[in-house]
Design a protein with these regions (language model features):
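Short, well-formed alpha-helical segments that are part of the catalytic scaffolds
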Residues: 12-27, 52
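Glycine-rich, basic loop-to-helix element that forms the pyrophosphate-binding segment
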Residues: 69-86, 99
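Cell-envelope/extracellular polymer assembly enzymes that use nucleotide-activated donors
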Residues: 2-4, 37, 202
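Donor-binding/catalytic cores of nucleotide-activated saccharide
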Residues: 76-79, 96-218, 224-240, 287-288
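A conserved acidic beta->alpha catalytic loop
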Residues: 22, 42-52, 71, 101
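Membrane-interface aromatic/basic loop that binds lipid-linked glycans or pyrophosphate carriers
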Residues: 132-133, 285-353
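Short aromatic/hydrophobic "clamp" motif used to bind/position activated sugar donors
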Residues: 91
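Short beta-strand/loop segment that forms part of the nucleotide-sugar
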Residues: 31-44, 65-69, 96
Length: 353
């Protein structure tokens, strides 16, 4: 089997009729009969999603496989189950409420298996014994996040130098428009965190930190939709805070294992800074709305500061990736928070000074 597409499904009957057609009619199946599969992982849906998937499988038995989980594992866990049960040399992920181009599988497969590396003669010579791409990346649309036609330039193809790898990490290129070589993912044991949200963010960061060689398609192949019933819209503020904070910690723990971490540390810290800024903004809101007591607020701020002191080793002002990628409010908030006197001042105010 050449390619497996993995699609987690949870309470998605509202979206499936719009999205399934482009999946089962992928051009890949016409060009490579019996060399592709789509694994739909039903994550204990309570609506008619499971029944819809079974009907689809009865119509396309050679292209689809359905896995019904008996325990909810969240989107990350469902993707992990899909990977474990898939057989493709390469695999990719789609969310069930997003729209895939009919050529998604084929275009990504051709890109990741291309035998003509893009780059200088010196680069080609250096890779003569190993010309395999670890991943291939295409572009995507996400109108509600203002990602209109977001795609990397072809110049990013080839072996990643320090600057290219740093850009991938700091810009947080989305996981849904990529195809992954199974042997690469298994080598670094890269999996999704389970039963949490924001699981795709640290996953992508760890992939980018370990990847050596990529091929880029300057083509929009995925449309990410803002769906009213999606899982990410059902979260409360407090749980979102926990998920975003833990996402930063997982990303740090995963990327810190890389031998070349120091070469992309500033880009990695930009990713942490963005999440810490979100957490600070969330805590401020919870405190102002009297959901957090003053004591709880201060203790949580202390926890954030300890994590920041461990994970942030470069000044925000002197970090070129932070300057390029952070929103102005994120940058200003973190510069203030990381001042030496901030926690002492907060403690003084808490004591009534």
């Amino acid at each position: 089997m050449k390619v497996s597409m993995i699609v987690p499904v949870y309470n998605a009957e509202h979206a499936l009729f719009d999205t399934l057609g482009n999946l089962v009619h992928q051009t890949f199946f016409d060009r490579y009969p019996e060399e592709g599969e789509i694994l739909f992982v039903n994550d204990c849906s309570r609506d008619r999603s499971g029944a819809i998937l079974e009907i689809l499988h009865s119509q396309f038995p050679d292209r689809t496989r359905i896995i019904h989980l008996t325990e909810n594992r969240g989107p990350g866990g469902a993707r992990n189950v899909g990977v474990e049960n898939s057989t493709g040399e390469f695999y990719l992920f789609m969310d069930c409420d997003d729209i895939a181009s009919p050529s998604l599988m084929e275009d990504l497969y051709l890109a990741v298996t291309e035998h003509n590396p893009v780059g200088s003669h010196a680069e080609v010579s250096r890779l003569d014994s190993d010309r395999e791409y670890d991943i291939a990346i295409a572009g995507l649309n996400c109108r509600y996040l203002n990602w209109e036609g977001f795609a990397l330039k072809r110049e990013f193809s080839g072996v990643l130098d320090e600057k290219k790898k740093s850009y991938l990490i700091a810009s947080e290129a989305d996981f849904r428009s990529k195809i992954y070589r199974r042997s690469f993912m298994e080598k670094y044991r890269i999996r999704f965190a389970e039963r949490v949200m924001a699981e795709d963010e640290d996953f992508s960061a760890i992939v980018h930190a370990n990847v050596r060689k990529v091929n880029v398609i300057n083509k929009i192949l995925v449309e990410i939709r803002d769906v009213e019933h999606s899982a990410s819209k059902s979260l409360d503020i407090a749980s979102t805070y926990e998920d975003i904070l833990n996402c930063a910690i997982r990303a740090y723990q995963g990327m810190r294992k890389c031998r070349d971490y120091d070469s992309f540390a500033k880009a990695a810290e930009t990713l942490y800074l963005r999440r810490f800024a979100f957490c600070l903004k969330t805590l401020d809101g919870l405190y102002q709305d009297s959901i957090l007591t003053e004591k709880a607020y201060f203790e949580m701020m202390q926890t954030l500061r300890k994590l920041s002191d461990t994970m942030i080793t470069h000044s925000v002002e002197g970090n070129e990736w932070s300057n390029a990628c952070l929103e102005p409010w994120e940058k200003e908030k973190m510069i203030h928070f990381l001042r030496d006197d901030v926690m002492a001042q907060m403690k003084h105010e808490q004591a009534g000074g």
